[in-house]
């Protein structure tokens, strides 16, 4: 009986020690999908983008960034065809005022595929932003696909950066995402 009690005590102490020791095995990167309603006063148009936070398992490197795909300059040309594009990194204070639709936890490998995809969009030559066919929704959709989500692009949502993530949430009920009005 005393031996059994000691074994139990040792197991409890080992479990406690393991729980208190920092481990990179607990590291993770979370990718949150955000939208912004737009503001005429702030000269901001509706937009969707991703926020990435966490720590890589294999290196311990901290991840704290956000990516959105947008036109380099907003002019009437955006209404008539492709224009030059960029990956835009929002200021932290701006991110806190946006709608967070849902979050995925991804592996280091998936994060790196997302990073490579973002770099490909950032470095694509020519006029790559198209309001109706290759916009912020297209970019965020590609990141969502890399995260394993089912994604589609209904034409009636291609200019609705808040409604589109709600649509993606309905295609992926495992997210348990709330609809943002």
Predicted regions and their residues:
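Serine/threonine-rich, low-complexity intrinsically disordered segments
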Residues: 4-6, 26, 72
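Bacterial N-terminal signal peptides that target proteins for export
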Residues: 2-13
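Activation targets extended, charge/polar-rich intrinsically disordered C-terminal tails
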Residues: 29, 37, 115-181
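Mid-length scaffold segments of soluble, non-membrane domains
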Residues: 85-130
